[in-house]
UniProtKB/Swiss-Prot annotation:
Subunit comment: Part of the 50S ribosomal subunit. Contacts protein L20.
Gene name, Swiss-Prot/TrEMBL: rplU
Top-level taxon: Bacteria
GO molecular function: rRNA binding; structural constituent of ribosome
Family in the record: Belongs to the bacterial ribosomal protein bL21 family.
Protein name: Large ribosomal subunit protein bL21
PROSITE patterns per UniProt: RIBOSOMAL_L21
Coiled-coil positions: none
Pfam families, sorted: Ribosomal_L21p (PF00829)
Length: 129
């Protein structure tokens, strides 16, 4: 009987890397950010291809270690984002009317968004991803 190798398959290694994430506070909301993924945040005052650093990191989870929870923020932690595009969200229609009256009001709104790609998640200058 031949022994099976004990090395991890490549899929498992990729899964370990994708298990790392950070929960950050941006635009008045909390986002779960994973490396090499893109997200839409409220409009940031940065040009396309600029790098933005978020310092308000609430939690960091490495693929192999336990989570590091901040009180309220993790000290020395940061997330680097690259601005990919400025775009607008879907149109939201707000329609108000009063029954049995001739009062009707229709408004439309499109939120200004910035699409960002997560470059790296780091703690104390050491990149997790």
């Amino acid at each position: 009987m031949a022994e099976k190798p004990t090395a991890k398959p490549k899929a498992a290694e990729a899964k370990d890397q994708s298990d790392s994430y950070a929960i950050v506070e941006a635009s008045g909301q909390q986002f779960l950010l994973q490396p090499n993924r893109y997200y839409d945040l409220d409009r940031l005052q940065a040009a396309v291809d600029d790098t933005v650093t978020l310092e308000k990191v609430l939690l960091i989870k490495d693929g192999k270690n336990d989570a590091t929870v901040g009180q309220p923020y993790v000290k020395g932690a940061s997330v680097e984002l690259k601005v990919m595009d400025h775009r607008r969200g879907p149109k939201i229609i707000v329609y108000k009317m009063r029954p049995k009256k001739k009062t009707r009001r229709k408004n439309g709104h499109r939120q200004e968004l910035t699409r960002v790609m997560v470059q790296s998640i780091s703690i104390d200058g050491k990149a997790l991803s």
